[in-house]
Amino acid sequence: MKLAVYGKGGIGKSTTSCNISVALARRGKKVLQIGCDPKHDSTFTLTGFLIPTIIDTLQSKDYHYENVWPEDVIYKGYGGVDCVEAGGPPAGAGCGGYVVGETVKLLKELNAFDEYDVILFDVLGDVVCGGFAAPLNYADYCLIVTDNGFDALFAANRIAASVREKARTHVLRLAGLIGNRTAKRDLIDKYVEAVPMPVLEILPLIEDIRVSRVKGKTLFEMAESDPSLNYVCDYYLNIADQILARPEGVVPQGAPDRDLFALLSDFYLNPAPNKVEQEDLELMMV
């Protein structure tokens, strides 16, 4: 099974991806996480350091694939999750899609691409050009990380459009949305009402999720010394269980940008009255 995780830049995709990878490993699966971001920090919370990228390794070998060994590019992370960082082209030059393609090509050359139960692509930001939409070419499911905000859901809608486009050529489904560190979900609910898709999980506003990124540890590793965090791990285990059940998923219909802008902005400008306030108002009118 191959997963591609997308979402607005800074929304917490890498933190979410790392914890999902560990959750899948806890369920007995052999997992490979591939970071698809020139910053090459996707697997930081799994390994505790910035591992060398595949592109850097290939350059050091003059692109002689036969001189590259699995241990040159695959690093063992927390919980037994294997980690790879694709890296990226020089800033302002090249194409990220080419880098992803070279990464998959090398892993296949090493007979590593088909050795895993789950491969998770953690893809940078909300860039959905042909290049950074490339992981969708290999994925069975796409997961979109969002919050309860306008910008994140606007980005989610554009990513959903990419899933719809890629689903024309191979079996690809949107597994659903993951709400990350959000105190409310009313805007998320408004969006999925307009654009039907599953919501896999809503993680509340938990400061330890942000802290885990700074510490370079997953929530599972932090919970080893602080059992009070086990309840946070349960959110990720729930996501893993849903994925392993191979959900039907959806080919999202999406919404035109202008329609979505009107829908979400109207939610902000004309919020629904508080339920308690509405009941009080009705009593006053009796």
Swiss-Prot record:
EC number: 1.3.7.7
Keyword entries, A-Z: 4Fe-4S, ATP-binding, Chlorophyll biosynthesis, Iron, Iron-sulfur, Magnesium, Metal-binding, Nucleotide-binding, Oxidoreductase, Photosynthesis
Coiled-coil annotated residue ranges, if any: none
Binding-site residues for [4Fe-4S] cluster, renumbered to this chain: C95, C129
Pfam (any one): Fer4_NifH
Pathway entry: Porphyrin-containing compound metabolism; chlorophyll biosynthesis (light-independent)
Classification via SUPFAM superfamilies: P-loop containing nucleoside triphosphate hydrolases (SSF52540)
Reaction(s) this enzyme catalyzes, per UniProt: chlorophyllide a + oxidized 2[4Fe-4S]-[ferredoxin] + 2 ADP + 2 phosphate = protochlorophyllide a + reduced 2[4Fe-4S]-[ferredoxin] + 2 ATP + 2 H2O
Top EC class for this record: oxidoreductase
UniProt: Mg(2+) binding residues: S14
Cofactors (names): [4Fe-4S] cluster
Note accompanying the cofactor annotation: Binds 1 [4Fe-4S] cluster per dimer.
UniProt-annotated binding residues for ATP: G10, I11, G12, K13, S14, T15, K39, N180, R181
Transmembrane segments: none
GO BP terms, alphabetized: light-independent chlorophyll biosynthetic process; photosynthesis, dark reaction
InterPro entries in UniProt: NifH/chlL_CS (IPR030655), NifH/frxC (IPR000392), P-loop_NTPase (IPR027417), Protochlorophyllide_ATP-bd (IPR005971)
Source superkingdom: Bacteria
GO MF annotations, alphabetized: 4 iron, 4 sulfur cluster binding; ATP binding; metal ion binding; oxidoreductase activity, acting on iron-sulfur proteins as donors; oxidoreductase activity, acting on the CH-CH group of donors, iron-sulfur protein as acceptor
Protein family per UniProt: Belongs to the NifH/BchL/ChlL family.
Primary role: Component of the dark-operative protochlorophyllide reductase (DPOR) that uses Mg-ATP and reduced ferredoxin to reduce ring D of protochlorophyllide (Pchlide) to form chlorophyllide a (Chlide). This reaction is light-independent. The L component serves as a unique electron donor to the NB-component of the complex, and binds Mg-ATP.
Quaternary structure (record): Homodimer. Protochlorophyllide reductase is composed of three subunits; ChlL, ChlN and ChlB.
Protein's name according to its UniProt entry: Light-independent protochlorophyllide reductase iron-sulfur ATP-binding protein
Organism: Cyanothece sp. (strain PCC 7425 / ATCC 29141)
Encoding gene per record: chlL
